[in-house]
Amino acid sequence: MTQPIPPQRPTIVNIAFWLVLLGAVLLLAGGLLGVTSAFTTPRSAFADDLSDSAVHSILVMRAGIGAICLLTGMGLSFLAGRTRNGDLRFRRSLVWLSVALVVLVFVLALLAPFAITLPALFGVVPVAIGATLFMRPASSDWFQDMQ
């Protein structure tokens, strides 16, 4: 007996995959930039009225947020690959991770704008659009057919 042919992957799923992957790459770049700049920024880059402990706190926060962006970028790229294959569980995980990332980055951009790098900030936009496209009815029907 021949195996049934799985349904053709819709274009909206491919577009969503590439958008999430683009956002993950931007998050990885922003995370690397944040981590390396936290370790290589000299004390003279800050105002003289800031204490050494305040400068240290800023640099630690920048490195921590950079590490979070790195881990999130790796997680999103893994989940996007599995989601592209039609696994419904990974699609849900990708969407929830995307929602958490968008909320986290925008709250941090409001409260601590010095800690978010521009690639990480711009990387949130394609991730949010891609996660939205994964939840559209055309792609949801394809995920249901794949199960």
Features from the language model and the residues they span:
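Topology signature of small-to-medium multi-pass alpha-helical membrane proteins
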Residues: 2-147
